[in-house]
């Protein structure tokens, strides 16, 4: 076995059972990994210097193929309603089969860190079959100083072999694709998929399991901080504007996707960004667009034209086109990945029913309710002519990555909000003047104006009304914003149609929250939409 690159000589791949490998390349940097990926035909060089790869059959995550080892340590710690179990015996069989499959291969290893806060950092070794995967994860996680690699010891190891196919009968899984996490041993096995995001989200899942035991809140959110040290957290599901709205030229970006919140403040889990690229434009998102013209950026499933220039409007491979780049490719990104205690929490939703106001102030109890609900709406099946919006509830704004019961995260959040006196807002980036198909998308200028007022504190002194359906406080007037847009009912041509639509959405919230009722106290149950209305 030939071993190349900088590494801890006493901690090679043989220590975790690999044998008879061809070449192992440790901690190669971008130029070397470009050479490898191009030599092996894994990717193409774009006209502007990025590396572009295709993932084949899997162009997104495979949540139904994700498993957690159920053992004595995890048995009563995991939310099994939301996580599929694999037995220790099946996991061990899978591990042995993957090690056997790797014999004769050349592999790539990156020694990286998840978590910018040293006290809560997770040293992570990622072993990949593909060179472009090695560059991807090197971009996404935190890269330790080169001198630290000689003594690096991982607490988590990820083995990603896309050419390995799982056997449902032998491994106790659903199909050939598998993402199996042994949280007790700190080992993740990925096979049968080339989608690189599985590696990133596996680190997130492990941190989401470990950190609550240390009273640290893991969050699927973006974060930024103003010149006065006023940190803001942006929760939101895909497509609600997390990345776009946290990229503010007047504020320092901490990170765009995964963070922890401890008694010291907020810290990024990552050292890079994984941004959606579909319909990316220089005019709308200049900083993110600029990264596509940088050496070192990895593009995933982006279509290239005959000149090897990316066509970001082409979704023929998938709508989920992505770009992965180091955080320092963004001009105003934090160098430390840390920030003081948050002053503001923004919960983003894209309400396609056109019912929610563009902004509302939440009590701590309402914040926990909406955090556990994790609501947004998407337009379902438009290609078949179906234009009815579809409600999506993803608890904690990231259900697929939350191994513990949502109430654990919700209670942590409620305590941190109360302890730090954080102001919470619900921001609707969805539809106004009617539902999807009738109304129009909330103007980004309106959203940015309202966000600016929320972040600088001026919105706190506005006059508020109590929303009749949802019970939260809605500003009546905000400088620079048309008063009418603040009251969604007044933007509809038919007020009674609005009332009926609002009632439908309230009922959806209540039905979804039923599973959490026994896990929260009365004050959170009383924060449910419609409860104030019902009491009157």
UniProtKB/Swiss-Prot annotation:
Cofactor section: Mn(2+)
Listed GO CC annotations: cytosol
Stored Pfam families: PEPCK_ATP
Localization (cell): Cytoplasm
Pathway it works in: Carbohydrate biosynthesis; gluconeogenesis
Note describing how the cofactor binds: Binds 1 Mn(2+) ion per subunit.
Chain positions recorded as substrate binding sites: 61, 195, 201, 322
EC number: 4.1.1.49
GO molecular function, one term: ATP binding
Chain positions recorded as Mn(2+) binding sites: 201, 220, 257
Recorded superkingdom: Bacteria
Main location: cytoplasm
Keywords: ATP-binding, Cytoplasm, Decarboxylase, Gluconeogenesis, Lyase, Manganese, Metal-binding, Nucleotide-binding
Residue numbers binding ATP: 201, 220, 236-244, 285, 322, 447
SUPFAM superfamilies named in the record: PEP carboxykinase N-terminal domain, PEP carboxykinase-like
UniProt record, GO biological process: gluconeogenesis
Reaction(s) the record says it catalyses: oxaloacetate + ATP = phosphoenolpyruvate + ADP + CO2
Family: Belongs to the phosphoenolpyruvate carboxykinase (ATP) family.
Entry-linked PANTHER family: PHOSPHOENOLPYRUVATE CARBOXYKINASE (ATP), PHOSPHOENOLPYRUVATE CARBOXYKINASE ATP
Function: Involved in the gluconeogenesis. Catalyzes the conversion of oxaloacetate (OAA) to phosphoenolpyruvate (PEP) through direct phosphoryl transfer between the nucleoside triphosphate and OAA.
Protein name listed in UniProt: Phosphoenolpyruvate carboxykinase (ATP)
Lineage, broadest ranks: Bacteria, Pseudomonadati, Pseudomonadota, Alphaproteobacteria, Hyphomicrobiales
